[in-house]
Amino acid sequence: FKGNKVQLAKNYSAPGFTTEKLKAPQLPDQAAIRKDKGASWFENRVAQPSAKTHKEYNAAPGTDLSEIIRSAEPGGIIVLVEGTYPIQSAMFIDKPLTIRAANAANKPLVRFNGEKSDNMVTIADGGELIIENIAFDGVLEPGKALAKAGISTATDMIQPYTLTVDGCEFQNFGEGGFFAIKGTKATFAKSVTIKNCFFRDLSGDAINYAAEKDDIGRYNADDMLIENCSFYRLLGLPINIYRGGSDESTAGPYITIRHCNFADCCNKERGSVMRLIGPQVLTVENCNFDNSGRVGATIRLDEATWEKVRIANCNLWNSGRMVTTTSQAIQGKMYNIRPAYINADAYNYTPVPGSELEKLSIGLKKNSLPQ
């Protein structure tokens, strides 16, 4: 037993070994090893992230928006001038894109006039969408199909996505199966941000991330922010978020809802303005409920004792009660103040400056939509 080499600490020796400093082994490149392995019919490729160009694409009324989106490069910005944009099929988002109005004060109007029911916008694998100051209108054209949703997801996604909706309007959708913004079953958003938006005259839900009903800890969006949004005359639920089961391997969703206004929403029996099932971390604050959830609830919260939930500084005027599972969710004082709005006839539900709600920082913030 001889001719062996070993690297030992000083003052140590081993019979049969020669002590010397050894070189670290040179391991082969793992990519080089793997590139020729696997089934012969499988093309072994590693997807490279696409560079974001931020190139602008201008669209005019009557333009085929689906075609512009198809041809746009990842990171592209599609700019719509004022006018009406009829679409016959969903705008398919499978890359990072921004769709925005050229002028926030004059929102472009998107209408669905396809022969077959579809979403107005569908987010698919690879999709990251920012959409700003666009109005989605559900007025039905004779002989045309109804839209299924304003913004929704493909049914066969395997990748997470992100969505930001800022300054948009969703209006005049009279079918109960319509959802303004919806996450479908087996889809997952890393983040969803909905702010400065206006939802009115909807028969279905405004914001629905409640498709996972198997009660095994799954949910449709991880990090959700709903801020400074106005809801008026909704038959469905303004906000519906569901995470069922008690699987401790899933830690979300994390939900923040603040400075929102609900007027004449979900006044059906056993209805809820907000239906929040199983959020792990939840903050609802500075919201105003006006003639909403009258024969049901303003907030229906199903939470466990260990979940971090907080409902604070809200106003309930002629509205339903808050229903919670534990006694820890409602913190601080709730108010019963008749709201005074800047111009409710023009759908501006911002509190009048100097009013009680404005002083308490309850309801919509300044410069809320619509103007």
Range-by-range predicted roles:
Residues 79, 86, 92, 100, ...:
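Extracellular beta-strand solenoid repeats
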Residues 331-371:
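C-terminal accessory segments
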Residues 2-5, 127-138, 159-172, 188-204, ...:
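Right-handed parallel beta-helix
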Residues 60-67, 74-98, 102-117:
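N-terminal extracellular ligand-recognition/capping segment immediately after the signal peptide
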Residues 10-12, 96-150, 338-339, 345:
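Right-handed parallel beta-helix/beta-spiral solenoid domain characteristic of secreted/periplasmic
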Residues 1-77, 355-356, 360-371:
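Extracellular "leader-to-stem" segments immediately downstream of a signal peptide or signal-anchor
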